[in-house]
Every structure is written in structure tokens, then in C-alpha cells.
From Swiss-Prot:
EC code(s) of this entry: 4.1.1.23
Keyword Lyase: yes
Functional pathway: Pyrimidine metabolism; UMP biosynthesis via de novo pathway; UMP from orotate: step 2/2
Pfam families xref list: OMPdecase
Binding site for substrate: 18, 39, 66-75, 130, 192, 201, 221-222
Phylogenetic classification of the source organism: Bacteria, Bacillati, Cyanobacteriota, Cyanophyceae, Synechococcales
Keywords (A to Z) from UniProt: Decarboxylase, Lyase, Pyrimidine biosynthesis
Name of the featured protein: Orotidine 5'-phosphate decarboxylase
Residues annotated as catalytic: K68 (proton donor)
Family the UniProt entry places it in: Belongs to the OMP decarboxylase family. Type 1 subfamily.
HAMAP family in the record: OMPdecase_type1_B
Length: 246
């Protein structure tokens, strides 16, 4: 089951603590007014270790652990079991790992959370990274499907395997939501509020538009973390969501 979402805009925004040292990430998260969710990615996790999840939870925050596990079924199961026991509420796995690995990961995540006395997390299958463009997928990976074909296929594979949601570009959110009603979670990076630079994201959308398209939650990093006034930038993102949430 997906983590419950309150009605407020702040519950829909996950701030990515990317590019920060551990102490900086903890301080930033503690000082951002109204923050509910944070994303811990590979760089921060490798530098800080698993304890960063506990430290953020001690600050009253909910954690999206974005490590994108992609391995054989037994290894993915072991990793998800331990990630769930840390208290992460959202955990990413690669859909390309295949149905056996996804099923093993899902079962292990439930087991790990139960053993730790926690509610089971939602696993999110990564479909196509938002940095990829269609021509590059064809040229570098010899994938002949269009992104519009590949993303729904991977999402369906994941849903059939029991995964509770997926990570997708906001540009694919409407099509996926039509196929997968809530509570299937759609978490979308590639969110760029009005006036923000696109950066290394190839498939982007504004916050209100992404929610209207069917996204459950939005991952926003640099437009907030690199802003002159991060709290004001976060508040502005929340304001942009007003009217987009039922």
C-alpha cells in the first residue's frame, strides 16, 4: 500500500538532498519550513551511510530512499529487506530487473518492515530515467521502442509483479494514470517550477501541471536546494500546487 498522502501541497513535494554532505543535508532539512518528505540518493547514502535515514526520521521527516536497486533477485531481495527495516517509506528498484526480481524485492520489503515493527514501504519501479531522450535510447542501447511505448510496458510489468508504483517523467504521468488508478503511486522527477533552469533533465513539467496529469508526488531538487531562499522556493512550489489537489 502506498504511503498515505495528506491533502496539503507540502505532502506532495519530495525535496532531493542531492549534492550535499551529510551534515549539510541534515541541517538543510531541519531548516526548511514545512518540509514533509526528503529524497536520499546514492551520493548522500554512500557518504553518510544507512544512519542518515534514521537521522532524518528523527527530525520528523518521511524518507524516499532512491538507490535504484538493479541486480539478481536474491540480491535485490536482500537490499530491499534491509532498506525497509531502516524505515524508508519509498524505495526505488529498476523495472528492467524483471518480474522475478521485482516480486522478490516486494516480498522482502514487506518482510523487512514487519521484522522491524514498521509499516511496509512502497516500492517504486524506475522506468526510463528522465535524463534519457528517445534518440539516445535507440542509438546507445539499441532500444527500438519509443519512450511512449517503453514506459507503459515497464509500468505494467511492475504492477503485475506487485510493485506499488513507479517513477516516471511527468510527461508520461497522464497515460500511466489512465492505466493504473490510485493507489498506484506515480512519483515524478523532472519538475521545474516557473523560471527554473532545466539542467540535465530532458523531459520536464511544472509542479501544478504534473499533479494535474496524475502524479502522486513530485521530486524537486535544485530549484529548491540551490535557491537563494530555499524556504521561499519551497513555499512557492506549494503555492503553485494550490488548486491542483482535490
Amino acid at each position: 500500500m502506498a504511503p498515505s498522502l495528506a491533502s496539503g501541497p507540502a505532502d506532495r513535494i519530495i525535496v532531493a538532498l542531492d549534492g550535499m554532505a551529510p551534515e549539510q543535508a541534515l541541517r538543510f532539512a531541519a531548516q526548511l519550513d514545512g518540509l514533509r518528505w526528503v529524497k536520499v540518493g546514492l551520493e548522500l547514502f554512500v557518504q553518510a551511510g544507512p544512519e542518515v535515514v534514521a537521522q532524518l526520521r528523527e527530525q520528523g521527516l518521511r524518507v524516499f530512499l532512491d538507490l535504484k536497486f538493479h541486480d539478481i533477485p536474491a540480491t535485490m531481495a536482500g537490499a530491499c529487506r534491509r532498506a525497509a527495516a531502516l524505515g524508508a517509506e519509498l524505495i526505488t528498484v529498476h523495472a528492467c530487473a524483471g518480474s522475478e526480481a521485482l516480486k522478490a524485492a516486494q516480498a522482502a520489503a514487506v518482510e523487512g518492515a514487519q521484522q522491524a515493527g514498521l509499516n511496509p514501504p512502497t516500492l517504486l519501479a524506475v522506468t526510463v530515467l528522465t535524463s534519457w531522450e528517445e534518440q539516445r535510447l535507440q542509438r546507445e542501447l539499441a532500444i527500438q521502442q519509443s519512450i511512449g511505448e517503453r514506459v507503459p510496458a515497464l509500468a505494467q510489468l511492475s504492477a503485475t509483479a506487485g510493485i506499488g508504483g513507479c517513477v516516471c517523467s511527468p510527461l508520461e504521468a497522464a497515460a500511466l494514470r489512465a492505466q493504473h488508478p490510485e493507489p498506484f503511486a506515480l512519483v515524478t522527477p523532472g519538475i521545474r517550477p516557473k523560471g527554473s533552469a532545466v539542467g540535465d533533465q530532458a523531459r520536464v513539467m511544472g509542479p501544478a501541471e504534473a499533479i494535474a496529469a496524475g502524479a502522486s508526488q513530485l521530486v524537486i531538487g535544485r530549484p529548491i536546494t540551490k535557491a537563494d531562499d530555499p524556504s521561499a522556493a519551497f513555499a512557492a512550489c506549494c503555492t503553485q500546487l494550490l488548486g491542483s489537489i482535490d
